[in-house]
Amino acid sequence: MSNPTLAAEVGRRRTFAIISHPDAGKTTLTEKLLLYGGAIDMAGSVRARRNQRHATSDWMAMEQQRGISITSTVLQFVYRDCQINLLDTPGHQDFSEDTYRTLAAADNAAMLIDAAKGIEAQTRKLFDVCRMRGIPIFTFINKLDRPGREPLELLDEIEKVLGIDVYPVNWPIGMGDTFRGVFDRLEHTVHLFDRTTGGKKMAPVTVGAIGDERMRVLMDEGTYAQIVEEIELLDGVGVPFDIERVAQGKLTPVFFGSAANNFGVQLFLDAFIRFASRPGTRSANTGVISPVAEDFSGFVFKIQANMDPQHRDRVAFIRVCSGKFEKDMTVHHTRSGKKVRLSRSLKLFGQERETVEEAYAGDIVGVINPGTFAIGDTICLGKPLAFEGIPLFPPEHFATLRNPNPSKYKQFLKGVTQLREEGAVQVLFHQDEAKRDPILAAVGQLQFDVVRFRLESEYHVETILEPLPWTLARWITAKQLEDLETIDWYFDSLGLKDHEGRLVILFKTPWGFQQMSERNPHLQFHEIAPL
């Protein structure tokens, strides 16, 4: 393949993740982006989803029962000749690890904000991750059809709390019950929307210039006068639109709308494919890897077991970073040093799947994984390389997981191992091998519920969960191996090992950790497992 052809394919890719606090409307926005992208012909509302229809991105049984997203899902579709790779992330804060891994595979982020609530805790945390990665952030302020805070107040909060400049690409016309549409500041056009039943179909829209008499008639005089005044204010005091600052993550384009009613969704999607970053370079141990480099490379950012209940297989999600992926290609697996044939490669759309013949930088490919891959693994052609690893979040909740049925222990251990490998939970073990019950370590309590639910539904194993009083963990390293044999133990601590045999110590309080670290200055204490 010639470089111009490769560059053209890469230039068509737009890969992004949606970040938000729970209940900001992320699942609804995802569905509406798919609706306007032509990937589905009817959007399923949350209310309908609880009865018959399930959101396209929510495929796991527990997600369908509870109406929440607890895993990241890949949704791919073509819109206006652009290949869109939409990485739908968990909305629940207990699953921030999965979201972090997904953001490692994204080139852009869409930050979703509830107009009534503004910046919330999870939004801020995930924004900080995006900022650390330096990726562009596009903001969609949702639920303008409900009572909410003033738009100027919301913009001010984004600037002050998140420390990023804002440029409202469009501006709401009305609020709550009077929300009619938006003014597009870049195109200088008014977009007035009509509601559809349940928001299942695209919203009819009337478009015209702000000075068009027809548009003035459709808006009442008070609304028209207010929108003209607010636009003049924005033009006079706001920062200018600068695509380079957007690409650097220093300026966020802001869009107003209502995902439930389809107001402003297409304007957001159109602007996104116009301004979003294309796949960029990636840092590896051999240097910077260009997306248009001839040799294929990619990394595993997610592993999901039992996506297909009929086959009980495991899928490794690979973000393509350079070159061209081809079905049945044999690649170098950097961690093991072995050659691996990628014979079963899939394009995924929620639970649906089809064979992938080729893919380019920015694309996400699913590969049936018989246990070869782990999260963070690099695969490549040409000179061996390794991309930067994906760290874990420090766990804050711990519990012993027991198997009450000895005859099911093999199945129990298989399930726990596979769920650990896909990042559903961290698993620790007693140093005394006679104590076989694993200790689960999680960022949030809901992770425990998911593990138990999946062990029962997918592996047919019943479990007993016993919460533990520990609140923090530290991985221990030392310059000299013998130093690990001469630890001065603090009485209120517990020494364990992780799946790779590395020493981990649990503490009940930060004070206990402080005592332990002061007693052992020759040791290094790490919040997360060293890469």
Swiss-Prot record:
Main localization, broad class: cytoplasm
CDD domains named in the record: RF3, RF3_II
Gene Ontology cellular-component annotations: cytosol
Domain of life: Bacteria
Annotated ranges, domain tr-type G: 11-280
Nucleotide-binding among keywords: yes
GO terms, biological process: regulation of translational termination; translational termination
Annotated GTP binding sites: 20-27, 88-92, 142-145
InterPro entries in the cross-refs: EF-G-like_DII, EFG_III/V, G_TR_CS, P-loop_NTPase, PrfC, RF3_C, RF3_dom_3_sf, RF3_GTP-bd
UniProt-recorded name of the protein: Peptide chain release factor 3
